[in-house]
Amino acid sequence: MLLVLVVLIPVLVSSGGPDGHYEMLGTCRMVCDPYPARGPGAGARSDGGDALSEQSGAPPPSTLVQGPQGKPGRTGKPGPPGPPGDRGPPGPVGPPGEKGEPGKPGPPGLPGSGGSGAISTATYTTVPRVAFYAGLKNPHEGYEVLKFDDVVTNLGNNYDAASGKFTCNIPGTYFFTYHVLMRGGDGTSMWADLCKNGQVRASAIAQDADQNYDYASNSVILHLDAGDEVFIKLDGGKAHGGNSNKYSTFSGFIIYSD
């Protein structure tokens, strides 16, 4: 069928005569004359030919018309994860955390190697230095406070030789001891009491039986508060004074402070 059309089209065009509106352009292309014929003759053909020539020299009109801009499309799906980035710099130090719970007790430690048992010098410096020792020079009798006026030691200056009393300045536990020589020869006895604030805390007795002299002695450990007084008082009899021989003595010292 295509072969028949190719053969017939040139025959029809050539038989149309001078009034025909078809020409063969090339071998197979056919262009219609858009202008009507003006009349017979060469003039009409010439005008149509000029118009056809002008029409064929211009570019064909575009059949594409630009429409309005469309709406934005839908958001696409997320792409695949990218590769890991470079390691960033260290961040600032955070605030301190809350205090944790106490941990479990640890296992017992290994036995120590042991030492010589010597007391460190720090122990000596922490104990207050309070101590005194005094002897009785002059004889006493009756119910007097014995005034041991021959003072040998008085660390801390807590003992007063004029009154025969020890006054506590540092509360703590103290040790006191006394020895009083009785002056006899008349068959009497002697009692010597250690008193704290006037109350008897220890007593001693010496009796004149077959000899003229005898000793009364005792010792105590007392807790003292600041201002407490400790002294030795006769409760009858005679106490012998030894000049500088210290036959009768009174002493004491602090064991430890409060």
From Swiss-Prot:
CC per GO annotation: cerebellar climbing fiber to Purkinje cell synapse; climbing fiber; collagen trimer; cytoplasm; presynapse; synaptic cleft
Annotated coiled-coil segments of the chain: none
One of the GO biological process terms: neuron remodeling
GO molecular function: signaling receptor binding
Gene3D superfamilies associated with the record: 2.60.120.40, 6-Phosphogluconate Dehydrogenase, domain 3 (1.20.5.320)
Tissue: Expressed in brainstem. More abundant in areas of the nervous system involved in motor function, such as the Purkinje cells of the cerebellum, the accessory olivary nucleus, the pons and the red nucleus.
PROSITE patterns linked: C1Q
Signal peptide bounds: 1-16
Low complexity composition bias: residue spans: 67-77
Subunit organization: Interacts with ADGRB3. Forms heterooligomers with C1QL4, when proteins are coexpressed; this interaction does not occur after secretion.
PANTHER family for the chain: C1Q-RELATED FACTOR, CEREBELLIN-RELATED
Function field: May regulate the number of excitatory synapses that are formed on hippocampus neurons. Has no effect on inhibitory synapses.
Protein name: C1q-related factor
Protein's organism: Mus musculus (Mouse)
Encoding gene per record: C1ql1
